[in-house]
Amino acid sequence: MSDTEKSAQAQPNESVEPSFRYNAKLAQGIEEKWQKIWDDEGTFWAANVNGDLKDGKGHNAEGRPSYFAMDMFPYPSGKGLHVGHPLGYLATDVVSRYHRMKGENVLHAMGYDAFGLPAEQYAVQTGQHPRITTEQNIANMRRQLHRMGLSFDNRRSFATIDPGYVRWTQWIFSRIYDAWYDEDATNPSGSRGCARPISTLVEQFESGKRAIPGFEGKAWADLSEAEQADVLNDFRLAYISKSPVNWCPGLGTVLANEEVTAEGKSERGNFSVFQRELRQWSMRITAYGHRLIEDLDTIDWPEKVKLMQRNWIGESHGASVHFDVETPNGVKDMEIYTTRPDTLFGTTFAVVSPEHHLLENVPAEWPAETPEDWKGGYATPVEAVKAYRLAAEAKTAKDRVDEAGEKTGLFTGLYAINPITGAKLPLFTADYVLMDYGTGAIMAVPGGDQRDYDFAVKFGLPVIYTVKPLPESGDDLANYEGKAPFVSHDGIVINSSIDATKAKGDSLSLDGLRVDEAIDKVNAWLESAGVGKGTVSYRLRDWLFSRQRYWGEPFPIVYGEDGTPHLLPDEQLPINLPDVPDYSPKTFDPEDAESNPEAPLSRNEDWVKVELDLGDGKKTYYRDTNTMPNWAGSCWYYMRYLDPTDTKHMVEKDEFDYWMGPDHNKTAGKSGGVDLYIGGVEHAVLHLLYSRFWHKVLFDLGYVDSMEPFHKLFNQGMIQAYAYTDDRGQYVPAAEVVEGPADANGEPTFTWNGQHANREFGKMGKSLKNIITPDDMYENYGADTFRLYEMGMGPLAESRPWNTRNVVGSMRFLQRLWRNVIDETTGEVRVTDGELDTKTLKLLNNTIADVTVEMEAMRPNTAIAKLIVLNNHLTSLDAVPRAAVEPLILMLSPIAPHICEELWSKLGHTESLAHADWPKADERYVGQDSVTAVVQIKGKVRAKLEVSPDIDPKELEKMALEAVADRLGGKEPRKVIVKAPKIVSIVPAE
């Protein structure tokens, strides 16, 4: 912090006279007083319609519309909060307080997302149980948030590690595990596709209504328990998969796709990640792909977040096509998905992922006349495939699909049969085909795809063009033949016809059709021939749901001696974490791709091996030693706020309908959900997508009545700050940096311990040594000044720079308000009960109207600017009228509640203003005599103010300087030219 900043920070505390001046010490006393009153009186208790939380301390639910506002709850880090963290919390609090004053029953609470890797890593280092560390961190964070004056209903607070909460997380997993997705069923919203209990699928198998996959012709009762479990596993929404996963030896755990960077490294720790085929829990989120996209239209979210989810889900329309593959073990089926079935006539080879099951059927010898460069230098296909698989395992997914990388691959010795033409297509394996994307197999059309073209050129494979440019394009296929593929969806189909004698079905000709027409026609042909059909695919992969870690929710699953999974009954929940001798998963050399996961829970053998009676006598079972990912607890926490004391229900129906049901208030709409959810855009894909998925499953199963969890989403910006480095590039404490004179270019200079320091602008963080904590602000200014400054820095959705020297301006506003009501010398109230003059009446009512609009639109910064104008006007009066200052106090109270409560009390009110009526403007005085004043700096417009036509030039100058204080960097301008009431031109100091 520079000397200027230090002096500015000290300024509010330098003067202790007069006795009743509003300063940091007085503010602290007022704030602690009112926080205790709020706690003691249950001021912010939200009233439920029934149950233990029905008491609203005189403000009960009957006849009052509900409003549910919440924040993305924090992870309780040992670092605590810095001033950048509370921006969203303060915004939600301002909105909550405003809606309370509108007469609404407001639910505003805070929980803690307490499972997570940092606490586990600390436990590994110290041997201290992560619960101890986490609960200490929660206590500190709860203290910091309480000191901020946030209007939480503290009866509803919880942490995701609480056994009572873990119970319901495991209960939800159980419901998802015990469900399947019936694409033919109608869900409660009326659209196709619905999760149903797995028992309904069993009924279909038992009745013969549905064939049993892999056991056609057999009765369900004839299958063994293990066989039945395997069949159902392929349908369950939570299922055990053995498929390629992201194995990170350096962390000792498997990662979800979303936890791997674009460089193929772990998001945490930057360790290498390898593709391995391991047994893991997954969730069938892909079943909900279409609904997750479609229902975005029903919710009020930022368009950029909706776009991010649409792109992540990646819905595409195409066809599923079946190719016969001739193997030594008989003809096998190879299913591919393509968005361009019209190009089937141009397919000249096929490619499967190195992990594809067909590679278990390669021949012992190379087919006759196999080109040498197809063999990769290996004597047999078996040797070639084995070596290629090992090489592929060592590559990251990013490396494998890199368009610029060299195309590798080799012939498998197998041939696939084109289902339309009957042509034999050599089947290659190549690592650019991923098993977890599509079906792990592709039909290659080198005439229409650059990657296929490059592969065909490398291996001497034929190229057939099946689309030519549109005549009106001016392009010609001759420009591409023998040189490049023609990659376009706009074109005319050629070389694409077959007669019935050669085809599996009727004759087919696509020649002369445009691509879209050809796709429709070939899809119909594929379905009629029984070799394919039009279908939808998604970029989204199923959610990898297990971790080889300790600090997470255990799975409510045990395994029999034969490995068959069994769901534990609800009455045995929660399954709590046992003590273990070592909290860390076994980690390996970060480059050891062949290592295998060893979870910490496996070390407590007494916990793992249990004797249970699950309905057929006591038997030995083995607990699952994986834990759920940290996303599990955050998927549903919003619902637990409705009543965390309820031990009988995850959420009781009447409470859900009142707080979150469709049309529960005027803005909820048919989607229902939380009325306002504020948090960072960085959660757009992971947390928000996972929460929507879980919610939709619970919606389908009848446990909740809204389609969506969050009706309105708002992403706050980031508070940024300057950081400083020495000449070695090492960060130095910002608080110890001294600002010096400007250099020859007019730029400020900085020193640290007498040495030159470099300034950079960006994030605030511990590693950058530029953290300022809320505790610093409370001590030097008070919580209300801190709240006022953060809410007034700029639009909530935009990032903005923190500048401690400008906090003083916020405190001065509160000091002026205080002086308008309280005599600083005597402490007596100094307002009058006289009538308002016309000018004050107009300004007051216009301010009420304008501030109401700004509060509805979540623009507290512009609301503050308008309140400053009104307060400045009252300061100019000989006597401050009660009729004007009381509405001012009410309007400011959501932003600076403590000082407003104190002034409200001193003005003779005995009830908290938290539930006072929001002021209403007298329309007779609204919209009159207002002009827009433009504030310029160096000729550029930097602010606009709505002011009275007869505003005093000095008052306009004061307003203008306050409006652009951040841009002036706390320095006095060199010159200010005021042309009231329309222009203020500022020349900044050099």
Please give the residue ranges for each predicted region.
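Alpha-helical recognition segments enriched in aromatics with Gly/Pro capping
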Residues: L150, L414-I420, K424-Y437, T466, ...
